[in-house]
Design a protein with these regions (language model features):
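NAD(P)+-binding Rossmann beta1-loop-alpha1 motif at the extreme N-terminus of oxidoreductases
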Residues: 1-53, 60-63, 90
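Hydrophobic anchor at the start of a short beta-strand
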Residues: 4, 27, 127-129, 173
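Fold-independent oxyanion-binding glycine-rich loops
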Residues: 9, 32, 64, 79, ...
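Electropositive phosphate-/nucleotide-binding environments in soluble metabolic enzymes
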Residues: 10, 14, 30, 34, ...
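Rossmann-like NAD(P)(H) cofactor-binding subdomain of soluble oxidoreductases
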Residues: 55, 61-70, 74-146, 162
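Internal alpha-helical scaffold of NAD(P)-dependent oxidoreductase catalytic cores
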Residues: 83, 94, 119, 123-127, ...
Length: 230
């Protein structure tokens, strides 16, 4: 059993916290607003971000960041990209020494325009942050619907620890050393998804959808290589 703190009380952070708890870990969610954390604790619900889901009694909720991360062996960053740098700055002097840090957010830091693991690594003063990304809706993970993601890091031992921490029969975690490729894929796929949705909304057919997907994937791969991915 590992002591885990999930930074972020959004839908994705909550779904992953429930998964980690189910896997036998001691899990605490940190959220920035004490009133809402109190409401979640009392009602065992997260109506703003993960409606219709009951939070397990064993899932801890905390608005004091120092208390939430105290003695944590793993810290999971489930922070919206536009708040990413601000929360990392708050966390920097509270992060337990030697803990594993996992970024599960998608996108780029709004302020620096850099990848999120790179932003976290710099602001937290640590060498390696694991990226966990893939096609994964929070509401489906919370309901135990089969899901596959990728954990990426240059530190093979660390990424294997994270794979073991998150994996179960319904949540498959693959591993990679291509952190850049995994993060870029997780962020840019949303642009492609929007384009396909626009095509559908305009009433275009399967031909247009297929063209957008195939050419979009090719462009994603080329961009990934240019930016240093494998």
């Amino acid at each position: 059993m590992s002591k885990v703190c999930v930074i972020g009380d959004g839908g994705w952070g909550t779904a992953l916290a429930m998964l980690l708890l189910e896997n036998g870990n001691d899990v605490t969610i940190w959220g920035p607003f004490a009133d809402y954390i109190d409401e979640m604790r009392e009602t065992r619900k997260n109506p703003r971000y993960l409606a219709g889901v009951t939070l397990p009694d064993a899932l801890k909720l905390e608005a004091d960041m120092a208390k939430a991360v105290a003695e944590a062996e793993v810290v999971v960053l489930a922070i919206p990209s536009h708040f990413y740098d601000k929360i990392c700055v708050q966390l920097a002097d509270k992060l337990p020494k030697g803990c594993d840090v996992v970024s599960v957010s998608k996108g780029f830091c709004e302020k620096t325009r850099k990848r999120l693991t790179r932003t976290a690594s710099k602001l937290l003063g640590i060498e390696d942050v694991v990226a966990l990304s893939g096609p994964s809706h929070a509401e489906e993970v919370s309901r135990g619907i089969p899901t596959a993601v990728v954990a990426a890091s240059n530190d093979v031992e660390r990424v294997l620890r994270i794979q073991k921490l998150f994996s179960n029969k319904r949540f498959r975690v693959y591993t990679s050393t291509d952190t850049i490729g995994v993060e870029l894929g997780g962020a840019i796929k949303n642009v492609l998804a929007l384009a396909v949705g626009m095509s559908d909304g305009l009433g275009f057919g399967d031909n247009s959808r297929a063209a957008l997907i195939t050419r979009g994937l090719a462009e994603m791969a080329r961009l990934g290589c240019v930016l240093g991915g494998n």
